[in-house]
Design a protein with these regions (language model features):
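Glycine-rich FAD pyrophosphate-binding loop
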Residues: 24-47
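Flavin-dependent oxidoreductases
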Residues: 18, 174-283
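Short beta-strand to alpha-helix junction loop
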Residues: 60-71, 95-104, 140-159, 166, ...
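Dinucleotide-binding Rossmann-like beta1-alpha1 core, especially the glycine-rich loop
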Residues: 51-126, 136, 252-254, 262, ...
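Helix-loop-beta segment of a Rossmann-like dinucleotide-binding subdomain
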Residues: 86-96, 108, 121, 126-161, ...
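C-terminal catalytic lobe of FAD-dependent flavoproteins
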Residues: 250, 300-399
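Beta1/beta-strand and adjacent pyrophosphate-binding region of the FAD-binding site
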Residues: 2-15, 33
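Helical element adjacent to the flavin cofactor pocket in flavoenzyme catalytic cores
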Residues: 140-196, 204, 382-393
Length: 399
């Protein structure tokens, strides 16, 4: 079976679906086919995160993350409101619990202001007015942070895009001929031909790029983020975060009250034994071998061994995880933490061991690859989708 289309999108996470949605809005009548190997949308990063609409306070001014998160947060709130999707603008606290964190907290204040985000500085006596159980030396309150149900957002994007979305359609082969577009053969033998290929494959994006004949110059290293549900959700009003270490693109163990009223605690960040390794027993030798064969992984491991061991300790020891939480909320007990589903973050790592700290979008002949889109990509998905669509339309216009 062979099908013809204008654009083939691989991946029905929130970025792939936002791209299909943006294409349909920017060029009505365009033919878009989305290929997704799972049986539904948003099965991996999109559907397995904290559900936070990030304000953009963390990100380097001028970066894609800063620009797209600040813009995307407001757009996501509007999108949810227009489509009746559960959401709430809750604000959040970022709490410094040690003196060594105070300079980093002040730097966040400056960064937030540079990004145009309203930030309020709080002393220790002011913290309980926002979160009665939180304790710290100082904190900042970011009023524009919110929460939503990204799985529902993805489903609405899928419906609104009018794209031909095919679930259970895993790309097996990709061929490309100069001036003649691309052809994707799925593992069931179907061939889909298009003029442009868009790679939004998330945890598999580097593999899809190589399948298309492009060198991504990075590898995805999967980091599992483990969560607990708080048995006493009344301890938390909204969102409580630690001060992150700027060396790492992870925000630390935090507490998030979701749209369902439950409070998620986490995530940590531990190396996963598979691209879709949502627990310790899940190990895929091919995935693990690919990680270990990448020189960048070993550079990264040597550089940050101490941090990595600490994360492993919090993964294997519930008591250690609880201690991390109690730095923010001393009232939390170990038996308050109930295991919840984990997520896996697709983190791009360069050959020299650099953790890619911004969104990464690259182009090849007839291809557009989204190669690094971890948090805050869900928040920023509408602007990311427009940017990818802009590049796709540029390729189509050039013929």
């Amino acid at each position: 079976m062979r099908d013809e289309t204008d654009v083939v999108v691989i991946g029905a996470g929130i970025v792939g679906l936002s791209t299909a949605y943006a294409l349909s809005r920017q060029r009505p009548g365009i033919r878009v086919t989305v290929l997704e190997k799972e049986q539904g949308p948003a099965r991996h990063q999109t559907g397995r995160n904290s559900g936070v609409i990030h304000s953009g306070v963390y990100y380097r001014p001028g970066s894609l993350k800063a620009r797209y998160a600040t813009r995307g947060a407001a757009e996501m709130v509007r999108f949810c409101a227009e489509h009746g999707i559960p959401h709430q603008v809750t604000g959040k606290l970022i709490v410094a619990t040690g003196r060594e964190e105070l300079p980093r907290l002040h730097a966040l204040v400056q960064r937030g202001r540079e990004n145009g985000i309203p930030v309020r500085e709080l002393g220790p006596s002011q913290i309980p007015a926002y979160e009665p159980e939180a304790r710290g030396l100082a904190a900042i309150h970011v009023a524009t942070t919110g929460i939503c149900d990204y799985g529902t957002v993805a489903r609405v994007l899928a419906e609104s895009s009018k794209a031909d979305i095919r679930y259970g359609a895993e790309a097996g082969l990709i061929s490309r001929r100069l001036g003649r577009g691309v052809a994707v053969r799925t593992k069931d033998g179907t061939v889909v031909r298009g003029r442009v290929l868009v790679n939004c494959a998330g945890l598999q994006c580097d593999r899809v790029a190589r399948l298309a004949g492009d060198d991504p110059k990075m590898r995805i290293v999967p980091f599992r983020g483990e969560y607990y549900e708080l048995a006493r959700p009344e301890l938390v009003r909204g969102l409580v975060y630690p001060v992150p270490d700027p060396v790492f693109p992870f925000l630390g163990v935090h507490l998030t009250r979701g749209v369902d009223g439950g409070v998620h605690v986490g995530p940590n960040a531990v190396l996963a034994g598979a691209r879709e390794g949502y627990s310790w027993p899940v190990v895929r030798p091919a995935d693990l071998a690919g990680t270990l064969a990448w020189p960048g992984f070993w550079h990264l491991a040597r550089r940050h061994a101490g941090y990595g061991l600490g994360e492993v300790g919090r993964s294997l020891s519930k008591a250690a995880f609880t201690r991390a939480v109690r730095r923010l909320l001393p009232a939390v007990r170990e038996d308050d933490l109930v295991p919840a589903p984990a997520g896996v973050r697709a983190q791009a790592v360069l050959r020299d061991g650099t953790l890619v700290d911004d969104f990464l979008i690259r182009q090849g002949p007839g291809t557009v690859h989204v190669l690094n889109a971890p948090s805050p990509a869900a928040t920023a998905s509408l602007p990311i989708g427009r940017e990818v669509a802009r590049r796709v339309l540029g390729v189509l216009e050039r013929g």
